[in-house]
Amino acid sequence: MMLAFGNPVYDSIRTPWVWTRDRVLSGCATNAGLAYVKMGGDACVVGRVGIDRLDHYHRTLKSAGIGHHTETCRESGGFKLDYDHQGRRELEVLGQADAITQIPDSVARARVVFIGPVLQETPLDLIRAIRTRTNATMVLDPQGLLRRVGAGGRIEHFKPDGIEELCALFDVVKPNELETEILTGVDPRKDLDRAAAVLEDWGIPTVVITLAELGALIVSEGQRYRFDALPTLAVDSTGAGDTFAGGLMFALSQGLNWRAAGCLATAVASMMIEQCGPEFELTSREAQRRAARVTVSERRPAATAAT
């Protein structure tokens, strides 16, 4: 079972190809859980949602076959996302749910624990407490740890104090390119090996960096795996990294090696971005078919100074 911590959000999304009439369910932990279950695994999402969205949230998760441990709060979280033709986006806060305060007992039985916050809802003390209560593989998507609300309700990014020590608590840390640069000070599009080396030097056993149309990198035990993205039309890239994480964690739960896991994760993400919303179509058969088409290069990275 995969246990995912992170608040759901109800987003308004506008891209060059799609514009949602109503706010749609999303969120890092939610999207990862959906992908994990659609691939054939068992998942439970831990988060907080406002009374206004509670019934819809529970119905959606039940329909998808996902368990939940939900705390209610004053309002549900959500963003307004505007994408340009290059895939760049602006985030405006529509609502912010409260921080998660409860750790379900099932954390002790989980095979994988995923921390996927959207906006500061997994306090550092909560993460440390989770680590002491589980022997599961722990995976971090740091996106919500690096966001705060700035002027006019716009999201701004920052590097929090103590993030290096926190990341070292995890077995796998998966930032995207923006988050990688915030964490390391290195643009991974310009020097990918150096950016990964900085994160490795923090004591992270496996570093996964996603790079949108440039694919992804996995570095583990001194081995470097570079995955090309599959060609597709990105109708809505919201949740691409989330579902990449879901596919990766499912692959690991099945005992796949890093090469095979990265191929499957790449395939899962390629299916998500062709669609919009939590009802995205994803089957294990199609994901496996696409995974077989992923181009991978493998080598040991050259010695790279991390400073």
Regions found by a protein language model. Give the residues of each.
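Conserved beta-alpha-beta core of the PfkB/ribokinase-like small-molecule kinase fold
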Residues: V112, G116-R194
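Conserved phosphate-binding/catalytic region of the ribokinase-like
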Residues: F158-E165, K190-T307
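Conserved N-terminal subdomain of the carbohydrate kinase-like
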Residues: Y10-R23, K38-P117, E121-T137, R289-T307
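Extreme N-terminal starter segment of soluble prokaryotic enzymes
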Residues: M1-L3
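Histidine-anchored nucleotide/phosphate-binding helix
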Residues: C28-K38
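Active-site metal-binding loops of divalent metal-dependent hydrolases
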Residues: G6-P8, T243
